[in-house]
C-alpha cells in the first residue's frame, strides 16, 4: 500500500486499520511517502476495544499511535457508536484523551448499522442516543475545536458528499 501511495504523489490516502501492523519501520515508511494518514479503529478505551477486537489489541493500537507520532505521520481514530459504548462517547474525557493525550488529528464516527448475515439491531443507537451524541459532537467541534466527523449524519447538515459534486458538500 505504501509503495502504491508513493507512485501517486498527487493524491492523499486515508486508510482504515486496526493498527496492529504499524511497527516503527512501517510508520517511518508512511512518513517518507508523505501522503498517507491511517484512521485507527477503536471501540472506545481499552476495555471496549479489547472486548470487541480481542485481548491485547488496544495495547498494540497505542504502540502504533506512538510509532506514528514519533515518525511525524498524521493519524486519526475511527469509532463505531453502539449502545455498548455510547455512554463513553458522550463524555468530554473520551475526546480529550484521543486528541490531547494521544494527539490524534481527526476522528471518524460511524453509527452502527445492522447489516450482514445476522444483523443485531440491539447494538443500534436509540433515537434519544443519536440526538445526545449529535449534541456532544456539536460541543466538541465548536468548543474544543476537535475535528470529529459523523460519517452518516453530517451528510444531512452539509448537503451530501463532495464526491457526488454537491455544492457545499462535506469532505470525506
Regions found by a protein language model. Name each.
Residues 1-111:
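Radical SAM/AdoMet-radical enzyme domain recognition
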Residues 112-172:
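A C-terminal junction/extension of Radical SAM enzymes
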Amino acid at each position: 500500500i505504501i509503495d502504491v501511495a508513493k507512485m501517486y504523489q498527487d493524491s492523499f490516502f486515508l486508510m482504515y486499520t486496526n493498527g496492529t501492523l504499524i511497527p516503527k519501520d512501517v510508520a517511518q515508511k508512511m512518513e517518507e511517502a508523505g501522503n498517507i494518514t491511517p484512521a485507527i479503529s477503536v471501540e472506545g478505551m481499552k476495555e471496549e476495544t479489547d472486548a470487541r477486537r480481542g485481548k491485547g489489541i488496544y495495547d498494540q493500537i497505542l504502540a502504533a499511535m506512538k510509532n506514528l507520532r514519533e515518525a511525524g505521520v498524521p493519524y486519526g481514530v475511527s469509532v463505531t457508536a453502539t449502545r455498548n459504548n455510547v455512554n463513553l462517547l458522550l463524555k468530554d474525557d473520551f475526546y480529550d484523551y484521543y486528541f490531547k493525550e494521544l494527539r490524534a488529528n481527526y476522528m471518524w464516527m460511524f453509527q452502527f448499522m445492522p447489516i450482514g448475515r445476522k444483523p443485531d439491531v440491539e447494538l443500534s443507537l436509540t433515537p434519544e442516543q443519536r440526538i445526545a451524541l449529535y449534541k456532544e459532537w456539536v460541543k466538541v467541534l465548536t468548543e474544543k475545536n476537535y475535528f470529529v466527523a459523523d460519517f452518516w449524519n453530517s451528510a444531512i447538515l452539509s448537503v451530501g458528499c463532495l464526491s457526488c459534486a454537491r455544492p457545499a458538500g462535506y469532505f470525506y
